[in-house]
């Protein structure tokens, strides 16, 4: 009897896409924790429709910080196109946003690179000093002592409620005719279309 699921978002989406709940709705699940990519609200809402009393927890974290550094307990309804918050840092982690000049971002609705530090941070990439030197760097906000941090390459922002939210990947930016375009914004717009699952 399974009471807790810790699954990749893609696994949860397979169940909702293939109408798995029409076949069977699990009886004993109390908690569902998911990570690996941004959870499409459309799919989360399908799960919540069939399992409304379950605690849903969005977990974020790259492998370089031992996979988990933030969590968000879903505490309200979300509409398609809304962004599910990433939540707050685990007690032994630091999670913060830096702008292109390595200045701390605290204001709302401004994208910055998500950076992480803490006791679970990896030491670098095995036999890859060049990549390690690019991604694992001294925290520019700390000039007092050695504090390595990891540049995730993820862009995030604080929403109107002050919650940390994933925007897109830094390497998903393209320039077209001098304009910076976030491919993640196109993906988010498509998520609002009910016919696209």
PLM-predicted stretches and their roles:
Residues 1-85, 92-94, 99-104:
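Adenylate-forming
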Residues 55-58, 73-197:
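AMP-dependent adenylate-forming
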